[in-house]
Amino acid sequence: MTRYASMVLANPVPGREDVFNDWYTHVHIPDVLTIDGIVAATRYRLVAQRGGDPAIAGFSYLTIYEIETDDLRGVFRTLVTRMGTALMPMSDAIAPERAFYDWEVLGPRVLADPAGVAAAAGAQGMPDTAISEESA
């Protein structure tokens, strides 16, 4: 099965941020996760922009959906068919301008090795407490 990351950039309607966030977290994501192949979702709020693509500069919220399927178009067909129905009601608190980017996963998720980080920190004269679990 092929793995994908689908990025959705969105904004709330001005003055409706609380309604937008409540709907997105408690209604929309659970609805999207009922679609076969969409296995996880994580939401993010922009805290800083350090250059990059000006086309996405106006968005404050990002959701990354993890998808596992051999039929990506079929997953999106189901998603589009359900949007705005009782199976996936949309909110008037989401601004109509959105951006969608889909990526194929090329390798496994790589995690830092705490022992390796500690060894490197010690070699650089950094205190081990700077990378302890308590401070992470």
State where each predicted segment sits.
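Macromolecular interaction modules
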Residues: M1-A136
